[in-house]
């Protein structure tokens, strides 16, 4: 937020609103400095998730997401929901349709359904797409199949991982995906190692209840290349695109086979998304991506990530001019 445009009285009001102390007797520039410092330190709690919120002026407190993803997902945005939703409400209010070309774990997308949005989700990774469509169409059977396979062992983990790309039965694919996701170190399907701690603490009855509670009634799913997906959805005044592409360099899980697809073409996707008017893209912060989007607005953000929520992720949110 640009505090320089506000009067000293308005700045004092903001200090009182956001609990900023030490402003009494200060000059305007000093008060702005206090507000900027508070912006960096401000945190929001969503359940067990602590979110660093860098923009007081766009702060939205989310006390419950209500519709929570059952998946652990590398680079997932569970802890960024408050920040992302603040950018949506500030820059793209009243949107009714959200397009997600990289649905992934779906944390933000599912949150947006609680705000009245219809979500069209897409993911190129077949097992993940299969998990979501199976959860949507036959969640009770999926939950029962997972229970039958519990508990997970290291040997079973290895067997499921080796067979998931060859399996043709959708229910078996979805079951395997969920079990691998809940018991790998990072939530990655094909590149995260087995974690006994995760197997004991994250593949539980409560995780299955979380799966059953997931409401996908306002979501549709497709299994397309991201550019093709956007081409299938012409822009309307009600539509917003939220894209969370694979990180530049560390592109671990994008692709129909979930391979290490360093071949994802970030430049092509940038060209595709910039043809539209209303969109938000989140990326890891690096010079290459900044150069691709140099004709756009770029905001630096940080949110916590990892199993202990103590690491900070340096990311950027990109919006059209």
Go through each PLM region and give its residues:
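Basic helix-extension-helix modules of the SAP/HeH family
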Residues: 1-49
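SAM-dependent nucleic-acid methyltransferase catalytic core
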Residues: 51-86, 135-255, 275, 286
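Short helix-loop-beta connector
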Residues: 91-97, 235-236
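Short active-site oxyanion
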Residues: 94-98, 117-118, 216-220, 273-279
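SAM cofactor-binding core of SAM-dependent methyltransferases
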Residues: 96-161
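Short His-Asn-centered micro-motif
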Residues: 100-102, 122-123, 222-224, 243-245, ...
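Short loop/helix-cap segments at secondary-structure boundaries that form the rim of catalytic
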Residues: 112-115, 213-214, 232-233, 287-295
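Long, positively charged, glycine-interspersed low-complexity recognition regions
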Residues: 259-321
């Amino acid at each position: 937020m640009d505090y320089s445009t506000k009067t000293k009285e308005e700045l004092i009001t903001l200090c009182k609103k956001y609990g900023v102390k030490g402003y009494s007797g200060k000059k305007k520039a000093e008060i702005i400095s206090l507000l900027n410092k508070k912006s960096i330190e401000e945190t929001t709690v969503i359940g067990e998730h602590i979110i660093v919120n860098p923009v007081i002026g766009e702060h939205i407190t989310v006390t419950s997401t209500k519709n929570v993803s059952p998946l652990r997902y590398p680079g997932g945005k569970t802890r960024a929901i408050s920040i992302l939703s603040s950018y949506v409400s500030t820059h793209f209010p009243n949107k009714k349709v959200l397009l997600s070309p990289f649905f992934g774990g779906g944390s933000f997308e599912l949150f947006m359904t609680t705000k009245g949005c219809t979500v069209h989700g897409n993911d190129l990774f077949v097992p993940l797409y299969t998990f979501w469509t199976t959860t949507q169409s036959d969640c009770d059977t999926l939950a029962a199949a997972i229970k039958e396979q519990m508990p997970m062992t290291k040997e079973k983990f290895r067997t499921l991982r080796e067979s998931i790309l060859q399996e043709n039965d959708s229910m078996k694919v979805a079951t395997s995906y969920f079990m691998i996701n809940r018991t790998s170190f990072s939530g990655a399907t094909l590149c995260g190692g087995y974690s006994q701690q995760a197997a004991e603490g994250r593949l539980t009855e409560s995780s299955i209840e979380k799966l059953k509670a997931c409401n996908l009634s306002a979501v549709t799913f497709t299994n397309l290349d991201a550019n093709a997906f956007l081409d299938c959805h012409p822009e309307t005044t009600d539509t917003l695109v939220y894209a969370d592409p694979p990180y530049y360099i560390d592109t671990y899980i994008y692709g129909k086979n979930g391979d290490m697809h360093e071949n994802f073409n970030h430049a092509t996707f940038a060209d595709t998304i910039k043809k539209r008017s209303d969109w938000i893209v989140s990326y890891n912060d690096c010079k290459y991506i900044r150069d691709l989007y140099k004709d756009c607005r770029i905001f630096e953000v940080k949110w916590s990530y990892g199993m202990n929520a103590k690491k900070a992720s340096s990311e950027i949110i990109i919006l059209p001019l």
